[in-house]
Swiss-Prot record:
Keyword Zinc set for record: no
Keywords: Cytoplasm, DNA-binding, Transcription, Transcription regulation
Family membership: Belongs to the TACO1 family.
Organism: Pelodictyon phaeoclathratiforme (strain DSM 5477 / BU-1)
Protein name in the entry: Probable transcriptional regulatory protein Ppha_0657
Keyword Cell membrane: no
Length: 250
């Protein structure tokens, strides 16, 4: 499951660029608001909210913004009601796509999703058409400079480690059951081991390996989704061949 890190490496680099976009805080505020609405405003008893707050802090969101988002979720402040809707479909070369959205206008969002698909050689599928290809997991990245593979295995197995991706030259990818992600984070915190990008992820059971031309088309499609304010996250079973990596990095 975790041996496919070339697309993960590109996603990590893309995230640095995405952080410069004005839509990042909008997406983070939505997630905090939704999490607070669903599970209450106390992060100690709401793992989804706790993770959302941690992500916001990691991206330098001011605490005032975080608190306002929480209060909008709990109803203490007036705010927009967000509906979470997940779309499924296929992109170039038959790769599977899951698009998670949070919207205040369902008709606008589905029209936007269809438009983006049609302009980028994709097609919208029925609910359940590709979801069975993915597993929901907790993931985070540990820089190789922070810990060794044996050290992480020994430390995290009892905390709930399921898999440790080691193909990336700069990071280990820790994969856990969703319910164990907080335990794994605490184990790393207690050991003073730095980590990044802790999140709930959708990981494909199997990957479709693409060459550079098709990979570029898929990345263009994903970029179009991620530039839409209603889209919170995009998942795919694309993997990029070794021969395509050098071309994509040019």
């Amino acid at each position: 499951m975790s041996g496919h890190s070339k697309w993960a490496t590109i996603k990590r680099k893309k995230a640095v660029t995405d952080q410069k976009r004005g839509s990042l805080f909008t997406k983070l505020v939505k997630e905090i608001t939704i999490a607070a609405k669903m599970g209450g405003g106390d992060p100690a008893g709401n793992p989804r909210l706790r993770l959302a707050i941690d992500t916001a802090r990691d991206n330098s969101m001011p605490m005032d913004n975080i608190q306002r988002a929480i209060k909008k979720g709990t109803g203490e402040l007036e705010g927009v009601t967000w509906d979470e809707i997940t779309y499924e479909g296929y992109g170039p070369a038959g790769i599977a796509l899951i698009i998670e959205t949070a919207t205040d206008n369902r008709n606008r969002t589905v029209a936007d999703i269809r438009h983006i698909m049609s302009r980028n050689n994709g097609s919208l599928g029925e609910s359940g058409s590709v979801a069975w290809m993915f597993q929901r997991k907790g993931t985070l990245d540990v820089p190789r400079s922070a810990a060794g593979e044996d050290q992480l295995m020994e430390l995290l197995l009892e905390a709930g480690l399921e898999d440790l991706g080691s193909d990336d030259e700069n990071y280990f990818t820790v994969i856990t059951d969703v319910k164990d992600l907080e335990r794994v984070k605490k184990a790393l915190d207690d050991a003073a081991i730095m980590y990044e990008n802790a999140k709930i992820d959708l990981i494909p059971e199997n990957y479709i390996e693409l060459e550079a031309e098709d990979a570029r088309k898929v990345i263009k499609l994903i970029d179009a989704f991620e530039n839409n304010d209603d889209v919170q996250a995009v998942y795919t079973n694309m993997e990029i061949s070794e021969s395509a990596m050098s071309s994509l990095n040019e």
